[in-house]
Amino acid sequence: MAEAPPRRLGLGPPPGDAPRAELVALTAVQSEQGEAGGGGSPRRLGLLGSPLPPGAPLPGPGSGSGSACGQRSSAAHKRYRRLQNWVYNVLERPRGWAFVYHVFIFLLVFSCLVLSVLSTIQEHQELANECLLILEFVMIVVFGLEYIIRVWSAGCCCRYRGWQGRFRFARKPFCVIDFIVFVASVAVIAAGTQGNIFATSALRSMRFLQILRMVRMDRRGGTWKLLGSVVYAHSKELITAWYIGFLVLIFASFLVYLAEKDANSDFSSYADSLWWGTITLTTIGYGDKTPHTWLGRVLAAGFALLGISFFALPAGILGSGFALKVQEQHRQKHFEKRRMPAANLIQAAWRLYSTDTSRAYLTATWYYYDSILPSFRELALLFEHIQRARNGGLRPLEVRRAPVPDGAASRYPPVATCHRPGSASFCPGESSRMGIKDRIRMSSSQKRTGPSKQHLAPPPIPTSPSSEQVGEASSPSKVQKSWSFNDRTRFRASLRLKPRCSTEEGPSEEVAEEKSYQCELTVDDVMPTVKTVIRSVRILKFLVAKRKFKETLRPYDVKDVIEQYSAGHLDMLGRIKSLQARVDQIVGRGPGDRKTREKGDKGPSDTEAVDEISMMGRVVKVEKQVQSIEHKLDLLLGFYSRCLRSGTSASLGTVQVPLFDPDITSDYHSPVDHEDISVSAQTLSISRSVSTNMD
């Protein structure tokens, strides 16, 4: 018998020329089976049975050796981008331990500033210059490397990629400050090392350009943005306070100048008076200029009491503005924490919605699970290796019933070897160790054998693994072991294997093939189960996301509590109003409401129309109509009884037809009025008299 190629994990299509599907990590690969064994290009199928894109990689390792170089380059590119992004975050957006580096840089800058200050003192000038020169070397190296790394790491942002993007990043204000400080430091070091006294004295002032290094500590400009936002938010109040304070300063300086210009030489000009007014109204008070006359003192005291209050207003406005802005930022951070739970909740809700079996047109979620589910390729190779080792190096198709020597038959129990075309060989003792791939493989190959051989095998009886090695001809004195928990779990109805391998010698090879393994686990059983498991996982994730989102909705402060209470109060008022409208629609409005509506803009016709719409108004209308009908029936019955008592047709015309009360029939109008009834009665009496005369 020729050795057939090993079969892969089939999804159980019909035999013949039908398409064949192969399962790889719960992702089917379907190919057309040709006449010579099939060599067409495979098509991957997802959990929904729809073909996946042809360029999508197969899950699991070993998907192809041709793309190994591309995968290595892609992995290297990913590592490069990850490193670039990490460095950019450390330098531009420090968090956690990254602050250690920035604190070290701050200490270097602060030390350089202190040494620059000490270098201007005559007693410490020589020592400070030597230490400052060494520190400047260190600062040049550190800041030069940092500047280059900053420009390189900016490529992780899309707008800073390429040479143009790097140049755009270098034009940022803080990068320009870094470049200016770096150039100034290099110039100072170069002049100091050459010993040029003139150049050193000229460039000594450039050291104070290094004060700009303190500005670079706030790379993101958060403090300047906060100050600008506070000034912009309270710009009207600040402009008003500054305007009134400026007017007070001008008038106070001018009046004091007029009062003191003749008696006091300190106020010889209006500029001297403005200097005195600025120092006095800002509560600094150097004391270099003071008014000497009583008129000047009185004016200075009055304008000081009035002007100081306006000059102090901007400080209070800015202080309260900063406090409100900081509180608002804290609230904003608290609200920003809700974004991720809200996004997770929306994503979980959509995935739960899309995994419903009634919505087969939503396939994106299933493609996602096709890509993350594990592969069975390593498991299949392991099973094949174990089978070869157990079969003595033979392939599964070459395994037959092994001959047992006569002497060994009495010492050892008979070993059952099974054969199944196109599949691996498993003995009953090994059935408990079969994986899902082998079970599906046995099911698919059992379907390919055709219905001619399947109907010959009787339905198998499941046996416990503990008693599988005991043959049918064994001694009856041996008691069979009871089912354990693992055996019951192993032989459930959904995952139960039904072997039909007999320990006795089979009559022929064909009978052994007919008694091959049967497996109830097919792809049709696996896929719905997998989808159900995925949907259950989506339900759990949705509930967890919902709980986390509710936890973030807790109030932040008293203002949030008041807002929640006010929103709840408005909601309650709306519900009460809706309930009152429904009650009015059912019961109707009371007499007090009617009087109120009659006094309003609505006319009586609108009021009656509203009352008739209500359920109670309709019930009252029906009752009035029933009463009117009853009254009319009573009148008709009385009229009919009087006609019967008269006895003759001649006296029918003399009977007076009773008239209906219009008040009773106000809500119900009969199609025949009382005048028509009297006329019809007279016509009836005339016709009867004519008929009697003719007789």
Curated annotation (Swiss-Prot):
Region (Disordered): 1-21, 441-483, 588-608
Intracellular or extracellular location(s): Basal cell membrane
Keywords on record: Cell membrane, Hearing, Ion channel, Ion transport, Membrane, Potassium, Potassium channel, Potassium transport, Transmembrane, Transmembrane helix, Transport, Voltage-gated channel
Annotated stretches, region: C-terminal assembly domain (tetramerization): 546-650
Catalytic activity: K(+)(in) = K(+)(out)
Domain of life the protein comes from: Eukaryota
Ligand binding (a 1,2-diacyl-sn-glycero-3-phospho-(1D-myo-inositol-4,5-bisphosphate) 1): 93, 172, 219-220, 225
Biological process, per Gene Ontology: inner ear morphogenesis; negative regulation of synaptic transmission, dopaminergic; potassium ion transport; sensory perception of sound
Cellular component per GO, a single term: basal plasma membrane
SUPFAM superfamilies listed in its UniProt record: Voltage-gated potassium channels
Tissue spec. comment: Expressed in both the inner (IHCs) and the outer hair cells (OHCs) of the cochlea. Reciprocal longitudinal gradients of expression is present in IHCs and OHCs. The strongest expression in IHCs is in the base of the cochlea and in the apex for OHCs. A basal to apical gradient of expression is also present in both type I and type II spiral ganglion cells.
Function field: Pore-forming subunit of the voltage-gated potassium (Kv) channel involved in the regulation of sensory cells excitability in the cochlea. KCNQ4/Kv7.4 channel is composed of 4 pore-forming subunits assembled as tetramers. Promotes the outflow of potassium ions in the repolarization phase of action potential which plays a role in regulating membrane potential of excitable cells. The channel conducts a slowly activating and deactivating current. Current often shows some inward rectification at positive potentials.
Protein's UniProt name: Potassium voltage-gated channel subfamily KQT member 4
